[in-house]
UniProtKB/Swiss-Prot annotation:
Protein family according to the UniProt entry: Belongs to the IMPACT family.
Comp. bias (Basic residues): 304-318
Gene Ontology MF, one: actin binding
Keyword terms of this UniProt record: Actin-binding, Cytoplasm, Differentiation, Neurogenesis, Phosphoprotein, Repressor, Stress response, Translation regulation
Highest taxon of source: Eukaryota
Region listing for Disordered, in residue ranges: 294-318
SMART domains: RWD
Protein name, per record: Protein IMPACT
Positions of transmembrane segments: none
UniProt keyword annotation of Disulfide bond present: no
Assembly notes: Interacts with GCN1; prevents the interaction of GCN1 with EIF2AK4/GCN2 and inhibits EIF2AK4/GCN2 kinase activity. Interaction with RPL39; this interaction occurs in a GCN1-independent manner. Associates with ribosomes; this interaction occurs in a GCN1-independent manner. Associates with actin; this interaction occurs in a GCN1-independent manner.
Species annotation: Bos taurus
Subcellular location: Cytoplasm
Amino acid sequence: MAEGDTGSDQRQNEEIEAMAAIYGEEWCVIDDCAKIFCIRISDDIDDPKWTLCLQVMLPNEYPGTAPPIYQLNAPWLKGQERADLSNSLEEIYIQNIGESILYLWVEKIRDVLIQKSQMTEPGPDVKKKTEEEDVECEDDLVLACQPENQVKTLDFDVSENRTEIEELPPIDHGIPITDRRSTFQAHLAPVVCPKQVKMVLAKLYENKKIASATHNIYAYRIYCEDKQTFLQDCEDDGETAAGGRLLHLMEILNVRDVMVVVSRWYGGVLLGPDRFKHINNCARNILVEKNYTNSPEESSKALGKNKKVRKDKKRSEH
């Protein structure tokens, strides 16, 4: 048994070294000890139209008797298209049992992306559909969690009369939380306009590890003195309801002029509701650390107020 494990380890290490040598910066180590890796695959390196992130975890039995545990991450990959690609990867494994297959998987995905780019253009319709689905999932939750003060939720493209500061704000990174091979890390930046939100996201995505996260959930709140209102918005990035929960936490803490992004790297084990606890704990910790929160008494009052709103909402639904 030990000899088999040693042989698997050696073959895995050789394959990992080969992948890093072949793909360079596209290949990303998420967790070396847990053997979780990620690679960003595009149809074209110079002018990518379609991109997909393949995340893999190598079990001890791979490549001898077990396949890699994998996840395909792309906002446009849904339904039959996702099923077809998954079937293709599983066929490759069946045809090459006992062999190292990561390279074959990557190149198969690249072939699919190239074919897709030749058949269609990634027009606004694809992106718009994804955004609308995300908004529909969150609308009820955000409305139920709104505090009594007037709040305005805006899309990035809406132009505001408020003077926009185009300087990239400083970004702080929180201490990661790891549970059952999933890792969560919060990132915080002061923001005073939606354009800065976009700048912060762009800067974070320059980091290949953050860009390859399974989910990058974020929320922001900007206070407009002249209108006595908040501009606020949130994004699930595929983790349903996580953005709304994060925004609700920021409302409870009564923070303003700040955005929080929480990156999650999925480790292959489902966490259930615990994932929301870790997302909010990451966010709360960095908000407290950077002195964005009110006193505990004020936060408790706000929490009570929000609970009352949610309870009234629930009663009306039943």
